[in-house]
């Protein structure tokens, strides 16, 4: 399901996960997303870890809180949250077990204590 959102600054509408507004270029207010959406990846198990790493460094360079230190308090806060979420998402996707768990959650499945999928 694609999330519909509104930019906190210019009020333009957008769909899906984006770090920045395409209209006013401000960092977006964080919205609920999963690790795959954070990186713009398809929800599938097989991923290119080298590309993931390169994309991680590229995105962190754009959203790192140090780049927002002299901007509004909203932008500074949003960059801190995005940066933290991206760090967590990167760790999830690097690890095969946590990546599998993230996929199962996305598809509405869980693994119980007896290792059966429900």
Task: Identify the function of each model-found stretch.
Residues 3-63:
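N-terminal J-domain/J-like co-chaperone modules of DnaJ/Hsp40 proteins
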Residues 36, 71, 101-105:
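Residue-level detector of alpha-helical recognition elements and their boundaries
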Residues 38, 44, 104-118:
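Post-J-domain flank of DnaJ/Hsp40 co-chaperones
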Residues 38-43, 54-77, 89-95:
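The canonical J-domain HPD catalytic loop and its flanking helix-turn segment that engages Hsp70
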Residues 48, 75-78, 82:
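Conserved acidic
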Residues 79, 83-86, 116:
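Hydrophobic alpha-helical segments and helix-packing faces
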Residues 83-108:
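Conserved alpha-helical segments that form or flank metal/cofactor-binding pockets of metalloenzymes
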């Amino acid at each position: 399901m694609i999330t519909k959102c509104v930019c906190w600054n210019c009020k333009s509408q957008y769909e899906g996960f984006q770090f920045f507004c395409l209209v006013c270029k401000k960092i977006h207010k964080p919205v609920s997303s999963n690790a795959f959406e954070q990186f713009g990846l398809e929800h599938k198990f097989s991923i290119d870890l080298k590309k993931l790493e390169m994309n991680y460094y590229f995105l962190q360079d754009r959203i790192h809180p140090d780049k927002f230190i002299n901007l509004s308090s909203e932008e500074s806060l949003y960059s801190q949250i995005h940066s933290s979420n991206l760090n967590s998402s990167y760790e999830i996707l690097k690890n095969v077990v946590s990546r599998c768990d993230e996929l199962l959650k996305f598809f509405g499945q869980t693994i119980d204590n007896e290792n059966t999928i429900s």
